[in-house]
């Protein structure tokens, strides 16, 4: 059916989507991605194409590509593909200078949050956030990112906290 529709109109989105799904079922994910890619690159794809494309990319382990594609997509596509988006973690309290010890909390729609407190860029080998962090006297440079259940990373946040206990 897809081939007949494509013979008449090679740019038919529904027919290309059907062809890609057929290729995926037969185990040819690479070809399925190649069929859908022009729609994504030309920004002409509807939400169905985006959903199938990011699903295939995720299955192929290309999660960074998923993140970049959805970051630049319009709101309708982002909403349709929300399960593939990992929002950046939120820190509380806000960065700044404080005169008392602070309890830092990180939250997000992530399965895990990785962080560093020395200003270095976190990796998946960094500490995993499991409980609030006590910020004591001195300067703390937090960097953190989240990973969702689809293994897609968020952007890295960077926050600076200065604790001065004996402030005049």
Regions found by a protein language model. Give the residues of each.
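Residues at alpha-helix boundaries and short interhelical turns
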Residues: 9-10, 43
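Short, compositionally stereotyped local motifs that mark structural "simplifiers"
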Residues: 17-18, 22-37, 41-43, 47-168
């Amino acid at each position: 059916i897809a081939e007949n529709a494509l013979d008449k109109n090679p740019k038919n989105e529904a027919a290309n989507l059907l062809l890609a799904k057929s290729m995926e079922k037969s185990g040819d994910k690479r070809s399925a991605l190649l069929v859908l890619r022009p729609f994504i690159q030309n920004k002409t794809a509807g939400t169905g194409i985006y959903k199938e494309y990011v699903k295939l990319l995720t299955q192929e382990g290309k999660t960074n590509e998923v993140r970049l594609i959805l970051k630049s997509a319009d709101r309708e596509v982002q909403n349709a593909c929300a399960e593939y988006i990992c929002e950046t973690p939120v820190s509380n309290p806000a960065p700044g200078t404080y005169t008392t010890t602070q309890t830092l909390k990180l939250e997000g729609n992530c399965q895990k949050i990785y962080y560093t407190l020395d200003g270095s860029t976190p990796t998946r080998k960094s500490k995993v956030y499991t409980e609030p962090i006590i910020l004591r006297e001195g300067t703390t440079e937090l960097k953190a990112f989240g990973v969702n259940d689809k293994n897609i990373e968020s952007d890295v946040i960077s926050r600076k906290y200065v604790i001065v206990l004996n402030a005049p």
